[in-house]
């Protein structure tokens, strides 16, 4: 949440906005920096995949598609966080707004299960991930629905890829619009 909120708080956002960089370049640069940092952390977790291959014979498909899905999920959540960070100079406000958006996108499955017809179908289309519980003995803590479930099963779905890329693009665009509006205030 420090990506843009800290810049606003310290007054360095004005320096960035008066530089020859366009707002899109600033937002995209901060997004790529956060995504690379996240991918380094994901890369460090590949140690566990190595241990799996040393002590067993796992199926490589779900492992690789899980990493692809995790990358796409991370890009979507980072874009939402960057947008929330652009809205306020307070990091806590950015955290609350970003968490609220992500929670809303996650619990859509819970809400849509209690609806029927077109409303349920529309809400299912906007679900970020599956709401699952470690206490649910039927799912064993694995997402059974949502856009991430196919990646966890080893299936690459163009619909799921397009969804995560769309969420990422929409929230990056909204972040650019917030910064452009700030310039004109």
Spans of features found by a protein language model:
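Transmembrane helix boundary and interhelical loop/hinge segments in multi-pass membrane proteins
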Residues: 1-17, 31
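Residue-level hotspots within the lipid-embedded alpha helices of multi-pass solute transporters
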Residues: 3, 38, 70-74, 164-169
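Alpha-helix N-cap/start motif
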Residues: 23-24, 91
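Secretory targeting signals
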Residues: 29-93, 106
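Terminal transmembrane helical anchor/hairpin motif
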Residues: 101-178
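Short cytosolic juxtamembrane segments of multi-pass membrane proteins
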Residues: 181-185
